[in-house]
Structure formats: structure tokens, C-alpha cells
């Protein structure tokens, strides 16, 4: 696709019918770590304005742990996983009570959805999330989504909801993603460093990720840094969704398409949510190693992975699981949904379709990974 201008991207955001807004913990809390009602109410006012103008808004909100740790007697955000989960269990209710009261002042209802990584990995849960969100939006509610911090572990997380927000944007077929943080824009280096310059527009976020120096950790009340926000913008851009990154106080202007923060252009036409799920949400359970010919065909982007071109199977997986497709040097080429169990595949390796049909039966005369279920990485 042709790269749009900054004006075109801002206009697309202003005209968006469905917007996903992500807000981090540090944008909702006081320095002490407690929820800041003024910040939360200001965000709600900005969202309510869009909603009352006929737009549809999904809010992905962090803040459960930040809302709960003070109530449970902690001076700061705990680092122990069990303590964090306890704080989230208490804080999520406090957070939603604040949101419910704030939106009610505008005559708007909210619906809470708590999600873990597994809810976007398993196809059935993924479809359930999509159906629930679509229905809430159709009924005029504002869905409020958070990672289920009381169940999630540090080993498998979205990253302060940043990646989650980009996946949700694709699930609801959003027209724009707004990432709210505690800095007003993306900079060429940490804003406190001399010579750091604000970046108002990123035509290709993948190029920017390689060039822009970003901090790797978040604030003392959040878990995400600028890296996860850039990754979220990349997921959105790859799936054809424009994005803007700015501070929470700029939420209203950002959704109106005003020149605040940093705008990110989409770098692909909108893809299917299924392919985005394969590429970004699914967690590979094993690896298929392709020979040089099969690797070349996979890189071409239009070929299925056939048993004749696979030389090794790694891992334990079932049909329908996500797997890596690697070359013989160990480089990841693609992710895909495999059509056979790992125990079935060894007997298939090196055989062409006719041989598979003859020696193993008709049910084996199919690609290991069909091209429709294969996403290059």
C-alpha cells in the first residue's frame, strides 16, 4: 500500500467509527500509587464525548494493581507475584466502581471483560471475546478490558495491556488505536536527555523501532515501557490500523485527530483477524524445520508447507496448534497452524502428496501447514 501522509492518518483517526483506547497505570494514579479521580474523570469525559457523537469506544485500562496495593497496606507496588495478584483482585473492583460512576454521569453503561493470554491463544476463547465485544458495542455500552492480573503470571503476560490493546483493535475491526501513557509523544531518545527530539509522525513503525532509543521499563506503578507501546503500534500498523501515542491529558484531542503526540501510519492494508491472531497472539508449541527448497517457497509467501519439504519436527503439539517454521539454520521464517499432531508427522516427512495418499491414506495427503494458516515473521 502507498504510505499515507500525516494529515491523512490524523484525518482517518478523526473519522474513526470504532476506536480502541489504551491507558496505563501511571496515567490513572497519583504519585502515591492511589487512583487519581481527576485523571480518571478527565479520560472518561474525553471518551464520553466521542461516544455521544456516535462513535464506538473500547477502553483497555490498566490500574487494578495500582488501585489495590495501597488499600492492602503496601507502600508501593509489590514485586511478589502472589502479592500483585491479591492487589489486582481488590483493585479491579475499585477501578471499575470509579469507571461505572464516571460514565454514568454521561448516561453511559460499561461492561467489564478480564482477559488472559490464553483467551487470545485458544481459537474458541478468541471467538468468544469477539462475540462479547461486538454485542456490548451494539448495545451501546463501553467495554472496559484489563488483563486478568489476579490470574496472570509474570511468565506469560501481554505487557501492561499494550499488546492486548492492539489485538483488541483488530478483533473489533477498529478504525484507530490510541495509546495513552505518561509522556506526550515518542522521542528520538528519552525526553530528559539533551538533544532528544519529539517525533510527530512515524510512516513505518518497523523502521522506527530500529532507530529510536526507548526505555525498557515502565514506571513504578506500571509494567510496560515505551518498547511495548511501540510493539503495540507495530501490531496495529501491520494489521492496517492507524495509531497515535500521547499522554492521557491529550486523549480528547488525539481522538479528534488533532496534531498531538505521535501518529503511526498503517503499513499494510487491513488483514484478517485470523491471520493477526496467528502472527501475534498465538504461542508456538513446536517447530517444523524446512529444507532449503521449502524455506524458499515459504519466504515467497504463497506456498503451503508440505511434508516433502520438512526435515525435522520439534516439540509436542496437537493438530490446530501454532508452530514455528524454521530453516535449517534455525531462523524463524513463519508461524502457522499445523494440520497434524506431532506424533503423526515423522512418518510423513520426505513424502510427496501421492506417496502420502498411497502409503498412509487420503487423510494424510494434505499440507502440514496450509498457506491460509501461515504468516511470515
From Swiss-Prot:
It is found in: Cytoplasm. It is an enzyme of class 2 (transferase). GO terms for cellular component: cytosol. Its EC number is 2.7.2.11. Pathway: Amino-acid biosynthesis; L-proline biosynthesis; L-glutamate 5-semialdehyde from L-glutamate: step 1/2. ATP binds at residues 22, 181-182, 223-229. Keywords: Amino-acid biosynthesis, ATP-binding, Cytoplasm, Kinase, Nucleotide-binding, Proline biosynthesis, Transferase. The keyword Kinase applies. Substrate binds at residues 62, 149, 161. The keyword Aminoacyl-tRNA synthetase does not apply. CDD domains: AAK_G5K_ProB, PUA_G5K. GO terms for biological process: L-proline biosynthetic process. It catalyses: L-glutamate + ATP = L-glutamyl 5-phosphate + ADP. It holds the Pfam family PUA. Residues 285-359 form the PUA domain. Signal peptide: none annotated. GO terms for molecular function: ATP binding; glutamate 5-kinase activity; RNA binding. This is Glutamate 5-kinase. It comes from Bifidobacterium adolescentis (strain ATCC 15703 / DSM 20083 / NCTC 11814 / E194a).
Amino acid at each position: 500500500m502507498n504510505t499515507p501522509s500525516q494529515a491523512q492518518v490524523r484525518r482517518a483517526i478523526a473519522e474513526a467509527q470504532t476506536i480502541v483506547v489504551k491507558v496505563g497505570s501511571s496515567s490513572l494514579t497519583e504519585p502515591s500509587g492511589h487512583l487519581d479521580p481527576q485523571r480518571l474523570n478527565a479520560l472518561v469525559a474525553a471518551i464520553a464525548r466521542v461516544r455521544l457523537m456516535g462513535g464506538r469506544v473500547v477502553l483497555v485500562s490498566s490500574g487494578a494493581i495500582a488501585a489495590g496495593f495501597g488499600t492492602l497496606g503496601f507502600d508501593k507496588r509489590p514485586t511478589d507475584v502472589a502479592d500483585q495478584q491479591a492487589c489486582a483482585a481488590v483493585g479491579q473492583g475499585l477501578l471499575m466502581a470509579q469507571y461505572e460512576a464516571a460514565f454514568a454521569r454521561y448516561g453511559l453503561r460499561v461492561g467489564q471483560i478480564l482477559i488472559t493470554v490464553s483467551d487470545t491463544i485458544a481459537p474458541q476463547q478468541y471467538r468468544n471475546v469477539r462475540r462479547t465485544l461486538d454485542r456490548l458495542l451494539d448495545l451501546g455500552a463501553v467495554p472496559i478490558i484489563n488483563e486478568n492480573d489476579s490470574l496472570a503470571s509474570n511468565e506469560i503476560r501481554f505487557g501492561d495491556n499494550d499488546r492486548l490493546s492492539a489485538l483488541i483493535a483488530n478483533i473489533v475491526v477498529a478504525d484507530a488505536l490510541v495509546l495513552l501513557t505518561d509522556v506526550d509523544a515518542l522521542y528520538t531518545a528519552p525526553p530528559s536527555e539533551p538533544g532528544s527530539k519529539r517525533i510527530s509522525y512515524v510512516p513505518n513503525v518497523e523502521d522506527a523501532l530500529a532507530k529510536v532509543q526507548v526505555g525498557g521499563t515502565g514506571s513504578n506503578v506500571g509494567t510496560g515501557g515505551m518498547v511495548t507501546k511501540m510493539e503495540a503500534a507495530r501490531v496495529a500498523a501491520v494489521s492496517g490500523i492507524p495509531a497515535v501515542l500521547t499522554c492521557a491529558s491529550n486523549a480528547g484531542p488525539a481522538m479528534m485527530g488533532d496534531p498531538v503526540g505521535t501518529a503511526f501510519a498503517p503499513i499494510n492494508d487491513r488483514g484478517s483477524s485470523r491471520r493477526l491472531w496467528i502472527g501475534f497472539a498465538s504461542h508456538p508449541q513446536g517447530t517444523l524445520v524446512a529444507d532449503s527448497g521449502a524455506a524458499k517457497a515459504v519466504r515467497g509467501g504463497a506456498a503451503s508447507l508440505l511434508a516433502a519439504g520438512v526435515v525435522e519436527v520439534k516439540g509436542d503439539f496437537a493438530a490446530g496448534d501454532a508452530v514455528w517454521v524454521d530453516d535449517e539454520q534455525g531462523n524463524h521464517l513463519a508461524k502457522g497452524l499445523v494440520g497434524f499432531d506431532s506424533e503423526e508427522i515423522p512418518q510423513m516427512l520426505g513424502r510427496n502428496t501421492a506417496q502420502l495418499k498411497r502409503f498412509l491414506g487420503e487423510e494424510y495427503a494434505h499440507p502440514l501447514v496450509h498457506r491460509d494458516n501461515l504468516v511470515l515473521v
